[in-house]
């Protein structure tokens, strides 16, 4: 049985040559399995913002510190560095108790039409926080490697530069904290 598995199937930049060096978020496809249910995989043919989704997932490793983080979906379709996604998303609730996290209320909205939602009603799984965290930290490592092996991004203005710095500061802080706690 697969309690929780999440993988990046592919990761790339926007296809437009005009945007390839100024795209600040990686895009691609995920495979997510929760409580033995496939939530998303290659068959869905949906493109997600990989880097911002992984930051959202990194935020979910520990109980939320503020309400703003709680209401950011786990898997975002778009939104750039501000993480202001359209309605297309994948999300689930998390309940933390001691060293256990419960994942439930999973849903996938696959268009901007509010009726295009799949609710995974039977999904309700308890796993060790360490297991949940390690899956996410592996993704974060992949995102970091992807960005490290790409040409330097072109930051068009002060706003891009500030957003970029803030994004990577938080990403790296949460990644390092998670690695120190869950891989020692």
Segments from the language model and where they lie:
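Short loop/turn segments at secondary-structure transitions that flank enzyme active sites
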Residues: 38, 63, 109
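Mixed-charge, glycine-accented linear interaction segment located at domain edges/termini
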Residues: 107-184
